[in-house]
């Protein structure tokens, strides 16, 4: 997720039903990896129809949004959780993760409302049966060169970490920070329930050596991974996907790989994601 991706959260409305046939293969890539997509990349954030779309693409799951600009409660409501689980079951697609992208607009580092969001997200994740919660730190929530905001986030994460530990849930920090900067936060919080949500494209945009960073953080500090491109299909942009695979192999990472962005200008989303899915499966199978 980045600043541009964050804008997609403001949509929050229903997407017209699609009637395309299923093109992809939904079989899990292997025992190590499951391939999903962010709901805001394949439709409006929070749209329950994302599971049917994911099925058409051939994905294993969807990373769903906790809330949207038009509904700050959304999945904090038990009825919405029930409907989301039913939609996933009907599509034969998993709920692959939870994300709080609204933190980009209403920042965790300064707005007291977000403390309840993050606390409640632990309960929501447990109810949905997911392990990892993405906490977005871009736009208004950017921590880069903000020691005061970073310290507030550390204190808030310390407060929620025991609850996450007890629930068996992990809070993942996705930001513009480097691996050493992330590690400083993780060490300050001091909880196995707070890790890094690693986005290979964002870190490439920042000029970091993503392959070294992946190895530095290791599987114990990376909770989940975004495979993303901006304006290109996955595998055709700036990120060297085979080298990402090698780095993940080297640290023994296993889990979800969620696709994000990766829709070239003028190319339909569905067509793009069918191709993105095939590309990732061909390498990670």
Predicted regions mapped to residue ranges:
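A generic structural signal for short coil/turn motifs at secondary-structure boundaries
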Residues: 71-74, 107-108, 144, 232-235, ...
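Conserved long hydrophobic alpha-helices within structured protein cores
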Residues: 55-64, 130
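Hydrophobic faces of well-ordered beta-strands that scaffold small-molecule active sites
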Residues: 33-38, 62-64, 95-100, 133-135, ...
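Active-site-proximal loop/turn and secondary-structure-junction residues that shape catalytic pockets
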Residues: 41, 66-68, 101-104, 137-141, ...
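Glycine-rich, proline-tolerant flexible connector loops at the mouths of alpha/beta enzymes
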Residues: 65-84, 140-144
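Histidine-acidic metal/acid-base catalytic patches
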Residues: 2-34, 43-57, 179-285
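Charged helix-capping and loop-helix junction motifs
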Residues: 77-83, 111-119, 146-157, 209-215, ...
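Active-site acidic/histidine proton-transfer and metal-coordination neighborhood
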Residues: 10-21, 25-27, 49-51, 87-94, ...
């Amino acid at each position: 997720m980045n600043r541009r991706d964050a804008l997609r959260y403001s949509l929050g409305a229903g997407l017209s039903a699609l009637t395309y046939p299923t093109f992809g293969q939904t079989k899990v890539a292997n025992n190590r990896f499951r391939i999903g997509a962010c709901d805001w990349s394949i439709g409006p954030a929070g749209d329950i129809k994302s599971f049917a779309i994911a099925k058409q693409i051939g994905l294993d799951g969807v990373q769903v949004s906790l809330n949207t600009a038009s509904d700050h409660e959304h999945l904090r409501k038990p009825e919405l959780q029930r409907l989301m689980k039913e939609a996933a079951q009907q599509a034969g697609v998993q709920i692959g993760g939870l994300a709080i992208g609204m933190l980009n607009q209403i920042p965790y580092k300064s707005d007291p409302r977000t403390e309840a969001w993050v606390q409640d997200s632990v309960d929501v994740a447990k109810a949905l049966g997911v392990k990892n919660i993405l906490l977005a730190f871009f736009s208004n929530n950017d921590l880069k060169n903000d020691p005061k905001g970073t310290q507030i986030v550390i204190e808030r994460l310390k407060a929620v970490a025991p609850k996450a530990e007890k629930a068996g849930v992990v809070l993942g920090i996705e930001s513009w920070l480097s691996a050493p900067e992330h590690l400083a936060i993780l060490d300050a919080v001091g909880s196995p329930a707070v890790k890094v949500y690693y986005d290979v494209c964002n870190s490439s945009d920042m000029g970091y050596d993503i392959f070294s960073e992946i190895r530095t953080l290791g599987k114990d500090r990376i909770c989940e991974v975004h495979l993303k491109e901006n304006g290109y299909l996955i595998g055709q942009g700036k990120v060297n996907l085979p080298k990402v695979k090698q780095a993940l192999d080297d640290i023994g990472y296993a889990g979800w790989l969620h696709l994000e962005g990766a829709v070239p200008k003028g190319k339909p989303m569905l067509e793009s994601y069918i191709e993105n899915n095939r590309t990732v499966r061909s390498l990670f199978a």
